[in-house]
Amino acid sequence: MLIWLADWLTQFDSGFNVFSYLTLRAILSTLTALLIAILIGPKMIRYLQRMQIGQTVRDDGPQSHLSKSGTPTMGGLLILAAIVVSGLLWADLTNRYVLVTLTVVVAYGIIGFVDDYRKVIRKDSKGLIARWKYFWQSVVALGVAFYLYSSATMSAETSLLVPFFKEVFPQLGIFFIIITYFAIVGTSNAVNLTDGLDGLAIVPTILVAGAFAIFAYVTGNANFAEYLNIPHIPLTSELVIVCTAMVGAGLGFLWFNTYPAQVFMGDVGSLALGGTLGVLAVLVRQELVLIIMGGVFVMETLSVILQVGSYKLRGQRIFRMAPIHHHYELKGWPEPRVIVRFWIISIILVLVGLATLKLR
């Protein structure tokens, strides 16, 4: 939005042309989202406490979690507000990729909000019934998938980039819709499963979003794309602004969510952040790299699938508790140790994902 104002003001002072530079707007986007989260955070936490919008803790989980009962939740609203406001201010809103991404942020945020509202405010322990949650996630994901497929103007927009292999860009055709669907819905639910310890989900989200900012920049830059031998998609450049807004908002939220957490993001945050990472992966054509960089999310999800499958088939559990972060807690690891070690794993995996730009 401000890019339009700066463009108009350029006729009076050429100095305003500086706001057309993507790198400057990326920095300002990060700082704007960070400041929004830092400044509004305390007020939101006090409001949530006053309204008694607190987390309910299961009594069959780690005993250390019982002290978390009543901690304000639905703090994801703070993250989403910071992302959307910063994105609207600093991104080019004529870019359809930006609009699609912000739509996913809001749509999945609404789904998560309804789930949290039913669980926390209406005291319905089941929240939004699973089949309805999945239904609405699917509606949004399929709507985005069909739109992106039908509006594609370049073959690169619907090709699959295979990491570590040079010049392997198979055309997906109609399978693009299927991959897009699973990328968005799958990542949304994976981040939701990961969000079980203080700061556990937000730091990998920040790291992956930061990496996608790099992918978006090089994919949208013709010179870098040619040098790295990746498809050039000009529209991805503006996604840098959304990615950096996610980084800033995430850092601001981490200020209050770090151990011991003053607020939890709730489903309104985790579902929206996961869905956004999924659509970003699709837009920058890095769905397979998302599996690498989001390895912590994948690990958490697989632990649940294996646990449920093993119990139904054999009547035995593989882990003491799933998702797997609870398994390590029940083994005696202090919560901060579990969190930081998962962060370290995430840092390593993101670096491996970034290395795919050159190692091919």
From Swiss-Prot:
Residue ranges of the TM segments: 21-41, 73-93, 97-117, 134-154, 168-188, 199-219, 239-259, 263-283, 288-308, 338-358
Alphabetical UniProt keywords: Cell cycle, Cell division, Cell inner membrane, Cell membrane, Cell shape, Cell wall biogenesis/degradation, Magnesium, Membrane, Metal-binding, Peptidoglycan synthesis, Transferase, Transmembrane, Transmembrane helix
GO CC aspect terms: plasma membrane
Broad class of the protein's primary localization: membrane
Task of the protein: Catalyzes the initial step of the lipid cycle reactions in the biosynthesis of the cell wall peptidoglycan: transfers peptidoglycan precursor phospho-MurNAc-pentapeptide from UDP-MurNAc-pentapeptide onto the lipid carrier undecaprenyl phosphate, yielding undecaprenyl-pyrophosphoryl-MurNAc-pentapeptide, known as lipid I.
Family: Belongs to the glycosyltransferase 4 family. MraY subfamily.
Protein name in UniProt: Phospho-N-acetylmuramoyl-pentapeptide-transferase
Organism: Alteromonas mediterranea (strain DSM 17117 / CIP 110805 / LMG 28347 / Deep ecotype)
